[in-house]
Amino acid sequence: ESSHAQVQATLSMSKKEYIAHEPVVATVTLTNNAGRDLLIHADDRTTLNWLDFEIKNSRGTSLSPLAAMNFGPVRIPAGRSIAKSVDLTGAFRVTEPGRFRCKAVIRLPEGGGNFVTNTTYFSVTLGRQVYSQRVGDPGRGDVREYRLSIHKTPQKSSLYVHLVDIRTGQ
């Protein structure tokens, strides 16, 4: 029996558009069709995670992980589903404006095979800045800027406050 028949995996994003530096949350849903409980964990021989993400920008360039993502073992009862939500902003540079595509790779242990979820698309924008104010002492190098941005979608308008260290741009 193939791993594809044993586990069904889908990927979804918490939304389609994000403001730069806000959490980009991806959710992987795994359904166990194997007829027995499954324990999915990192491969002890290769130290590969059981879950990885592949993200490409609009030019088709793969984004390299900025940090390792470590996921503990997951038990999926027979006939049941589990969902794992992951904030991708800590592991990938998805803070710059642009359009991205993402898919998840699931590795079953003990040679159970690898498979890939559906591809989802999301974009990151700066929003429209409507106000900014610098505060602090330039002589001491501790100037910060408060920025107010609006982001509109067909469903709603959102107001964001950004606090930026002028020295670092962060």
Listing of model-derived features with the role each one plays in the protein:
Residues 119-145:
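Low-complexity, Pro/Ser/Thr- and charge-rich linker/hinge segments at domain boundaries
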Residues 138-164:
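Short beta-strand elements that form the blades of beta-propeller/WD-repeat-like
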